[in-house]
Curated annotation (Swiss-Prot):
GO terms for biological process: rRNA processing. This is Endoribonuclease YbeY. Belongs to the endoribonuclease YbeY family. Gene3D superfamilies: Metalloproteases ('zincins'), catalytic domain (3.40.390.30).
Length: 156
């Protein structure tokens, strides 16, 4: 399915100030790219947060007392009910910005990577086991490169 045929209902919530953030159009493009081979219609929320909210959510849901770049909260519909609701992504602007600096990556490219990475988690991909990590990283690389950015796992 082409990106233009896909219907995305993207709710963007910005709960942080003072950061260079991607536009709604950029976020939608990245979501469509991540989902293009799997869904024709999707609803999701991207919430962009500060360090405190990210750390609190990471502690509550993952038991890690530190902020993180992206958290994924997939929606699971009850059996027999089909909804296009994919779930929620929570992205910490400060962590994304610092990682881009530390990894010597363009900020927009790193934002694209985090959105694609989070969407793949919403689709059920994971990187806990090595085999899963290789599969997920390979797919992420293909998707990110299709957007015109370089391999996010290549050393800069």
């Amino acid at each position: 399915m082409s990106d233009s045929q896909m219907v995305i209902d993207l709710d963007v919530q910005v709960a942080v100030e003072g950061f260079e953030l991607p536009s709604q159009a950029e976020l939608e493009l990245w979501v469509k790219t991540a989902l293009r081979d799997t869904m024709s219609e999707a609803e999701l929320t991207i919430r962009i947060v500060d360090v405190e909210e990210s750390q609190e959510l990471n502690m509550t849901y993952r038991g890690k007392d530190k902020p993180t770049n992206v958290l994924s909260f997939p929606f699971e519909a009850p059996p027999g009910i089909e909804l296009p609701l994919l779930g929620d992504l929570v992205i910490c602007a400060a962590v994304v910005e610092q990682e881009a600096i530390d990894q010597n990556k363009p900020l927009l490219a790193h934002w694209a990577h985090m959105v694609v990475h989070g969407c793949l988690h919403l689709l059920g991909y994971d990187h806990i086991e090595d085999v899963e990590a290789e599969e997920m990283e390979s797919l992420e690389t293909q998707l990110i490169e299709s957007l015109g950015y370089i391999n996010p796992y290549k050393e800069q």
